[in-house]
């Protein structure tokens, strides 16, 4: 047996069907876990061993196990013993909810319970609860989602498995773009700065970009720009901690001008710097700067 990195964090996610296991795995993935769902228990030790040999490339692994595994499910206790034998510590996250809520969720989704193929949903739930009783007793964490919204579940998982705010699990991506080249489709926030004075109409500035000091000075010297930037940073400063608290992992802020070469580039750089100074992980992307084939006609209008 090869040496295994014992620092790897392994979380086994299981519990009642309909209690939120799939959603939990999705949120754990946002927190930096490598997630595998509906894995036969017999494969768990081998997978844990393989990921323990990645030399730190994967340090957080979450495995989803549920009753859909059918005849494989009884193997889980033996698999847990094997994982312990190879030196990988694990935690069991058991997702639960009241029978009443589980029945309602199944009826709302019109899905069939895996253990109630021909019978009532409640019969399947009660049978599953009996089968999982021993595993529930081994759980490190039990999360009851009876009264939880998806946002509540995200917050709870972030509290138990998240890291510091400054970690890469919350990241801000600031994108400059030109409206004439199309919108940024995955943007969470979009700001249109085409109302600002346009360097395109200053001959000496036209061939430059928003990364050139002369363009930055021109864009930022106007009172309207300064007022807008002050209000922009005020809004972003208000929003960021609320996005973190909600459990959002990636926030994309798009700033657009006509061609994506001058005004949006300048303001995207300044905003990214401002966000970075406040301790957040941030990157900046200038999607449309420059497009060599279009340089002769960039920013044709105000």
UniProtKB/Swiss-Prot annotation:
Q: Which residues bind GTP?
A: 66-69
Residue positions binding ATP = 15-22
Q: Which domain of life is it from?
A: Bacteria
The GO terms this record gives for MF are: ATP binding; GTP binding
Alphabetical list of Pfam families matching this protein: PapZ_C (PF22740), RapZ-like_N (PF03668)
Q: Which UniProt keywords apply?
A: ATP-binding, GTP-binding, Nucleotide-binding
Q: Which HAMAP family match?
A: RapZ_like
Summary of the function given for this chain in its UniProt record = Displays ATPase and GTPase activities.
Q: Which family does it belong to?
A: Belongs to the RapZ-like family.
Q: What is this protein called?
A: Nucleotide-binding protein STH186
């Amino acid at each position: 047996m090869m040496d295994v990195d014992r620092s790897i964090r392994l979380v086994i996610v299981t519990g009642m069907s309909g209690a939120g296991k799939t959603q939990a795995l999705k949120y754990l993935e946002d927190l930096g876990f490598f997630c595998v769902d509906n894995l036969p228990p017999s494969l768990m030790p081998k997978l844990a061993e393989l990921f323990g040999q990645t030399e730190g490339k994967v340090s957080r692994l979450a495995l989803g196990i549920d009753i859909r595994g059918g005849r494989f499910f009884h193997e889980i206790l033996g698999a847990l013993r094997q994982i312990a034998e190879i030196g990988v510590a694990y935690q069991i996250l058991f997702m639960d909810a009241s029978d009443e809520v589980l029945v309602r969720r199944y009826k709302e989704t019109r899905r069939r319970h895996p253990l109630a193929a021909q019978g009532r949903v409640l019969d399947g739930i009660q049978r599953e609860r009996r089968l999982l009783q021993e595993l529930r007793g081994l759980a490190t964490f039990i999360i009851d989602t009876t009264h939880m919204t998806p946002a509540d579940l995200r917050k709870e998982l972030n509290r138990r498995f998240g890291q510091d705010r400054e970690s890469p699990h919350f990241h801000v991506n600031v994108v400059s773009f030109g409206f004439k080249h199309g919108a940024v489709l995955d943007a969470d926030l979009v700001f249109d700065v085409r109302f600002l004075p346009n360097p395109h109409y200053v001959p000496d500035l036209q061939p430059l970009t928003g990364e050139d000091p002369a363009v930055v000075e021109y864009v930022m010297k106007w009172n309207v720009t300064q007022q807008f930037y002050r209000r922009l940073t005020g809004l972003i400063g208000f929003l960021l901690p609320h996005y973190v608290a909600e459990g959002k992992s990636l926030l994309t802020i798009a700033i657009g001008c006509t061609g994506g070469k001058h005004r949006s580039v300048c303001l995207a750089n300044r905003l990214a710097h401002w966000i970075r100074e406040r301790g957040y992980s941030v990157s900046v992307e200038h999607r449309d700067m420059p497009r060599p084939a279009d340089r002769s006609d960039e920013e044709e209008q105000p």
